[in-house]
Amino acid sequence: MKIRVGFGYDVHALVPDRELWLGGIKIEHTLGLLGHSDADVLIHAICDALLGAANMRDIGYHFPDTAGEYKNIDSKILLRDTMRLLREAGYELGNIDATVAAERPKLNPHIPLMKKTLAEVMNVDEEDISIKATTTEKLGFTGRQEGISAYATVLIQRMGS
């Protein structure tokens, strides 16, 4: 069986007058993430991990922030397209293990809906997606509530293996 591991990371600044999207869902908060797309750091980290595992470069290569077509795009579209690229290359998802680092808002209540949403977009089982939330104990840019970051590790395998 041919299996591969990928790692992804993303970070965006928190700013006023933007919606907060994480894991494909809108979360009520006074600040949102700044970015060319909807700035969903969790989805972006997952996309990077998937592309890296398949040795297909990164999210910026496939969906450049210099392209107008991706301005304010829903990151679920990027994830769906990443899964299409992965499957076209002959891979399927084994599992995802992801962590989101944010001081606020508290994310644990939102994790079940994030998992459900991501599983639907990716056409995988919810049990194949693990999402954890943490803080940085008020340290660094995350602790000062200046931004949110996400880390994702994925396992992929050749289809039919």
Curated annotation (Swiss-Prot):
Pfam name, any one: YgbB
UniProt keyword Lyase, yes or no: yes
GO MF entry, a single one: 2-C-methyl-D-erythritol 2,4-cyclodiphosphate synthase activity
Enzyme Commission (EC) number: 4.6.1.12
Residues the record marks as site: Transition state stabilizer: H36, T135
Keyword Metal-binding found: yes
Pathway(s) of this molecule: Isoprenoid biosynthesis; isopentenyl diphosphate biosynthesis via DXP pathway; isopentenyl diphosphate from 1-deoxy-D-xylulose 5-phosphate: step 4/6
Catalytic reaction list: 4-CDP-2-C-methyl-D-erythritol 2-phosphate = 2-C-methyl-D-erythritol 2,4-cyclic diphosphate + CMP
Signal peptide span: none
Binding site for 4-CDP-2-C-methyl-D-erythritol 2-phosphate: D10, V11, H12, H36, S37, D58, I59, G60, T134, T135, T136, E137, F141, R144
InterPro entries listed in its UniProt record: MECDP_synthase, MECDP_synthase_CS, MECDP_synthase_sf
Entry's cofactor comment: Binds 1 divalent metal cation per subunit.
Superkingdom classification of source: Bacteria
NCBIfam families documented for this protein: ispF (TIGR00151)
Self-association state and partner proteins as the record states: Homotrimer.
PANTHER family in the record: 2-C-METHYL-D-ERYTHRITOL 2,4-CYCLODIPHOSPHATE SYNTHASE, CHLOROPLASTIC
Family of the protein in this entry: Belongs to the IspF family.
Alphabetized HAMAP family for the sequence: IspF
Described purpose of this protein according to its UniProt entry: Involved in the biosynthesis of isopentenyl diphosphate (IPP) and dimethylallyl diphosphate (DMAPP), two major building blocks of isoprenoid compounds. Catalyzes the conversion of 4-diphosphocytidyl-2-C-methyl-D-erythritol 2-phosphate (CDP-ME2P) to 2-C-methyl-D-erythritol 2,4-cyclodiphosphate (ME-CPP) with a corresponding release of cytidine 5-monophosphate (CMP).
Name this polypeptide is given: 2-C-methyl-D-erythritol 2,4-cyclodiphosphate synthase
